[in-house]
Each structure stands twice: as C-alpha cells, then as structure tokens.
C-alpha cells in the first residue's frame, strides 16, 4: 500500500499526536492501512474497540473506543454499529458477542488467546462447585464463555474487590488469576478460594527489577497491575487496573513513572501525558501483538473471523457479565 499525498493528508493529525513515540519512516508503513480502515468502517457502520495493550497505531490510529476490559464490555452492549471489530484477544471478542448477540463480532486473529483464559475450563469450574457447594463463583473477565456460563458474576481488575464484597458472603471461589486473587484477599475480609492461573506478561516482573529501576531513577513512581506477583505489588507505590493506572498518571503527573504492565500501554499513555517521563520495562503480550493493521483491514473488508456461539451458551454466560456491569467499578 502506498503512502501517497492523499493518505498523508488524511492521517497527518493522527501522526502529530504520536510522532514523539514513532519515527516517520515507521508511520509511513502504518498510515495507508489506517486510511483504508477508517474509510471502510464508516462504509460498513463498524465500530473498532481496542484494549489498552494494543500498539499506538491501533490505539490512537483507528480505534473508536480504547479502554480496559470492563469498559469494552459496556461499550459493546450499547453500540449502534452493525459490526464490532475487537482489537484485543479472544475472550474480549466473546464478551462483546455476549453483550451484543445480534451484532456481527469480528476478531482479526482467532489465535489471539490468553494464558489466563486457557488455564481453566467450564468443567474445571463445575468440579470446583461440587467441591465447594453453595460457594459463589467470581470469574475474572479473562475467561472463556464456557467458564462464564458456570460463573455467578464476572469481574475485572478494576472492580474485583467491589464485586467480591457486594456478594455479602464469607467465602468465594475466585478464578483464574492466582495473583489477582491474592491481591483481592489483602483488600477484603472474604475468604478467597483461588485457581493457579497467571498472566504470562505480569508474572515475569519481580521486585529486584523494580528496586534496580528505583536506584537508577530517584523519585520515580512505580505503579503496578494486580496481576503481578505479591513481591511486585509490595514494592510499588500504587496498584490498579489499566484504567486505574491511566487515571493515576493523568491526575498525579509524576516526573517519572514506571508502569508495571504490558509495554504498549506505556507508549499509549505517554502520548496523552507528554510531560511525564516513562521508564519502560518492556514485557510484551504475544497474543495482543497478533492483532495488526493488515489483519484488521482484511477481517473488516471480508467480514471474516466472526465469533459464533450457541444461543444456550450466550444466555448462560451473559448473565455473569451483565451482573458485573450492573455493579460497575
């Protein structure tokens, strides 16, 4: 595809926004796709939803709405578009389908999975419910529709503590992220029965890395995602969901900050906070990085990679997500 004068003119305002983090030679390879995608989505009445971990050319270049998992689910439920293209991973596209079952939901790469989602099955949940009869199941939204169908209420990292406390019980089964479960347990009096799932990005971080960053950057603020190991949480100044981390930077405007999460998010937040210096520990999510501009254009143009589920699964799984969105943040 050609980076001609028409493409350059149409995408120039976008590039101005992200030029500090992307050289023009790289932009010239992205701009033709951005131009075509933005034109095509209007023709097809499509909406592009992007998770905070998407790369800047997607996050700032083509997405109509960029957010964390909770906000993406809410947006999917209320969109007036005919087609939803989920620039994220498979469970996010499934969740969009649950919230808008009559919409066509597309995922640019069907192999964009998640280590948390793949760590547990619906059968695993049924076995846990037999082992702990009567104990409500809270599942992280990073799970398959089959798991959500066996779940009482879903949660995200933004509202996990609120969800658990809202149930008014002494004990819950919390799935599948063991580190998030440990974090929630420190914030509530409810007993947490956890599962041994982990995020392959966040589990790589450790407190030694943080201490070294602090040593080389006096005064830096370290903010971590609750999917990180406990030693990382304890070594950080703030712990929060991706939306919480974005809010922290926006409101506090620290001189320097280290965001202990997926690397692309720091790039995206840096664009909107140019006065803040970001020290970036670059752990990338290989699943999120399967989503690229060429794949987005192809799936939108040909309407391929549609998310399909049985009516029974949608009806069962949707209840747990709707309950989550009703409780909110």
Task: List PLM regions with ranges.
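Active-site loop-to-helix "anion-binding N-cap" substructures in soluble metabolic enzymes
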Residues: 2-259, 263-329
